A protein has these predicted regions:
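Helix-to-loop junction immediately C-terminal to a conserved catalytic motif
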Residues: 51
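Conserved ABC ATPase signature
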Residues: 135-139, 143
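Catalytic Walker B motif of ABC-type/P-loop ATPase nucleotide-binding domains
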Residues: 160-163
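Conserved beta-strand-loop-alpha-helix hinge in the C-terminal portion
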Residues: 215-230
Length: 230
């Protein structure tokens, strides 16, 4: 479903310091894949290519058969790949939960009459049914992150990418979000890519990639990663 080969990227342009230096990755349909590495190693830069948030400078990347280098695929990729980022507050566009989840649906061609049902279904999928009229400032960190996820789910993406989605949460919030991620993977058969620097968050993944200085240096099961020599 996702095939990335020799991805190289520099925020300063092709001749600048590389954030990615030949990264490669394969994600099969229905897999839960974790990308593990320290801060600044290129994890987030890599996954922002999946839905064309960053342009492809070098290498090849296909997502469900679509060439990420083709600008005509940009909006299709953004509907195919839903992303949840680190800080839920930065993802809110409204102070009301239901309005936030509904934001942008019309721009993606969802008929206005369908939007309330989409919002309700997305909130139910993250165990927040009935929260449509709640103020976002009354929510816990874990609840805010699940609302952000509901906004992604309302577009029915086939692939979910979580970019350090638990990094700013307390232990209870982390567990709420991790439980939701694994439930969506197992019950709704979503393909999931989870970016993290916590090995314990990668334990339940089908496969783990270890990235260092913009390049994959190992991949395997979480157990294999735990037994890798330093």
């Amino acid at each position: 479903m996702i095939d990335a080969h020799d991805i190289r990227f520099s925020y300063d342009g092709p001749g600048g310091r590389r954030s990615l230096n030949g990264a490669k990755l394969h994600v099969a349909p229905g897999e839960l894949v974790a990308v593990l590495g320290h801060n600044g190693c290129g994890k987030s830069t890599l996954v922002k290519h999946f839905n064309a948030l960053l342009p492809l400078q070098h290498g090849t990347l296909t997502v469900d058969g679509m060439d990420a280098a083709d600008p005509d695929n940009r909006w299709a990729l953004r509907r195919k790949v839903g992303m949840v980022f680190q800080n839920p507050d930065n993802q809110f566009v409204s102070t009301i939960v239901g309005e936030d989840v509904a934001f942008g649906l019309e721009n993606y061609g969802v008929p206005e009459a369908e939007i309330p049902a989409r919002v309700a279904a997305a909130l139910a999928a993250v165990d927040m049914a009935g929260y449509e009229n709640r103020a976002t400032h009354t929510l816990s960190g874990g609840q805010k992150q699940r609302v952000a996820l509901a906004g992604v789910l309302a577009l029915s993406p086939d692939i979910l990418v979580f970019d350090e989605a638990t990094a700013m949460l307390d232990p209870d919030g982390r567990q709420e979000v991790l439980h939701t991620i694994h439930r969506l993977h197992t019950q709704q058969h979503k393909t999931v890519v989870m970016i993290t620097h916590y090995i314990e968050e990668a334990i339940g993944a089908d496969r783990v990639y270890l990235i260092h200085n913009g390049k994959m240096i190992a991949d395997g099961t979480a157990r294999e990663m735990l037994t890798q020599p330093e």
